[in-house]
Amino acid sequence: MGPLWALRVAGALSVAGVLAGHDGSQRAGQPAALDAGTRGDGVGHDRGVDCREVRKRNSSERCRFVRGTPDCRLDGGFLDYLGGAFCTFPSSLLPLSVSLYALWLLYLFVILGVTAEKFFCPNLSAISTNLKLSHNGLGVVGHSLTPALHGVTFLAFGNGAPDIFSAVVAFSDPRTAGLAVGAIFGAGIFVTTVVAGGIALVKPFAAASRPFLRDVIFYMVAVFLTFLVLYFGYITLGEALGYLGLYVFYVFTVVLCTWIHRWQRGDGPPPPGPWEPAIPTDAEEQESSGTNCGDYGEEYRPLLPYHETSLHILSTALSPLDKHKWRRKPWYWRLFKVLKVPVELVLLLTVPVVDPDKDDLNWKRPLNCLHIVTGPLLCIFTLKSGAYGLYQIQGVFPVWALVALAGSVLAIIVFVTTHNEEPPKYHCVFAFLGFLSSAMWINAAATELVNILRTLGIIFELSNTVLGLTLLAWGNSIGDTFSDLTMARQGYPRMAFSACFGGIIFNILVGVGLGCLLQMTNSQMVVKLEPDSLLVWILAGALGLSLVFSFVAVPAQCFQLGKAYGTCLILYYLVFLCVALLTEFRVIHLAAT
C-alpha cells in the first residue's frame, strides 16, 4: 500500500502542476497560439512558406526555392540533404538520391546501435563501478538494492541513449518536434504491443504482478501528462522539470519496492525488476560467460605470459575482427560484420573503452594515449557541426590546433609514465572520456538521422509525426526487439516483458523533459508543442488505450500471459498502423466546420 499510495499522491501533484501551469489567461512570455498551417507536421511551428511546397514547383525552380526558403534550412548536421536532392542531383535522378538517402538512413541506425552497445554502455558501466554503485550504492539500504538502482539509472540511460539523443535533437527545432513526439509515442506503442505480444507468443509465462502494475501506472501517468501538454500547446520550465522529477520518483519507487520485498522475504535476493536480471543459475552463467559488451581484443591468450610490443598492442586493439569468432559464425553474421567494420574502426580510434570485467580493465597503452588526442578533437569537431573546432583564437590560432597540441603533450606524458602490462591508477578517467566521446558520436548520428528523415518527409510530403512513429520508432526499437525476443526464447520471458514497460518510462520522461528543457533560454522559458494534426491525437489515444488494455487484461488473466494475449496486442498494433497511415493520407480526416 505504501508505494501505491505514494504513486497516487505523486500523480495528483503532477497533474495539478500541469493544470496550474496552464490556468488563467496568457502569461507574459507565453507563446501565442499558432495556426495549424499547411500540411500538418504533427506539432505546429511558426513559419512562412512550407518547404514541402518544393514538390509543387517546376524542376528548374526547385534548387532556388530550397536555397532561398528559411523553412528548408536544416539546423546542425554535416550534410545538406535537401541541397543534394534538389541541387546536386538533377530532377531525373531524384529516385537515385532517395535510394542513397534510404541506405544512409539504415546505416545511421547501425552507427547508433554499435556506438551505444560497444562503447557507450561499457563506459557507463565502468563509471557506475568506479562510483561504487555496484558495491554499496545506498549504504543504509543494502547491497541487494544496488542492481535495481543501477538498472533504472545507468543501464536505462545506456539502452535508451539513441532514443534520448534523437528526441533532444528533434526538439531543438520546432520544425522537427513532431519527429520527437511521433518517435516517443510510436516506440512506446510498438514496444508495448508488438514486442510484448511477441514475447507472449514465443514463451507463455506468468508476469511479475507488482512490478508490472507499477510500471504500467507510471507509464500511463507519463502519457497522460504528455497528452495535457499537447492539449495546452506548450510546456513550461516547471513542467519540464516535473517530467524529470517524476522519473526520479519512479527510481525511488523501484528501490523502495525492492527493499520492501527484501524485508518481507528476509535476507534472500530481491525479485528481478524491469532492469535487473535474476541471479543466474550455473547454466545461465556458462551461457552469459561467452558474451560481453565488446568483442574487441578477445583473441585467445597464450598460457604463458609474454611482453607485447606497443606496436603489436596497437595493431591488435585496432582490429575490430576476431578471427576465431569469424570462423564459427554464419555467413549473414559475417556480412553484417563487414558493414560494421568501418564504423567500429573509427570508434576504436576515437573512443576509449574501460571494461571492469577484464583483468587489465581493457588498458591498451598506445591506443589509450592516442585517445587523449583523438577524443577531445572529436568533441570539438562534432559540436555545432565543427564550428567550435574551426574557431580561431585572436583570428590566428585555430581551436582544434590548440586542443591537438595540449592532447599530444598529455599523451606523451601518459605514455612515458605508464607501462603496457598494468593500467595506471587514474585509468578510470578514460571511462569518462569514452562516455563523452561516444555520446558525441551518438549525438552527431542522431542529428544526421533527424535531418535525413525531415528531408524524406519533404520529398514525399509526409508529416514528421508519421515518420517518427514509423521509421524513427522502428529503427530505435529494433535492438530492443531482438534482445527481448532472444531473452524470451532463452527462458527469461518475465525479464524481457518487464523491460518492455520499464525501458520506455525512461524514454518518455527523460526524452520529453530533457529535450524541452535544453531548448529553453532566459528569454523564452516555454517550448511550443501545438499539435496541428489529427494523427498526433490518434497516436496518443492509441498508446493510452493499449496501456489500459494491458492494465485490465493482464490481471484479469491472473498475470498468466499466453498466445491469445500476444495475438491481440499484435493485431491491435496493425489496426493502429492502418488507421495512422489512412489519417496521414487524408482518407480519415475531421469534417470541415
Swiss-Prot record:
Domain of life: Eukaryota
Biased composition (Pro residues): 268-277
UniProt-annotated glycosylation sites, renumbered to this chain: 58
Gene Ontology biological-process entries: calcium export from the mitochondrion; intracellular calcium ion homeostasis; mitochondrial calcium ion homeostasis; mitochondrial calcium ion transmembrane transport; regulation of lymphocyte chemotaxis; regulation of store-operated calcium entry
Signal peptide limits: 1-20
Catalytic reaction annotation: Ca(2+)(in) + 3 Na(+)(out) = Ca(2+)(out) + 3 Na(+)(in)
Name this protein carries in UniProt: Mitochondrial sodium/calcium exchanger protein
Protein species of origin: Gallus gallus (Chicken)
UniProt gene name: SLC8B1
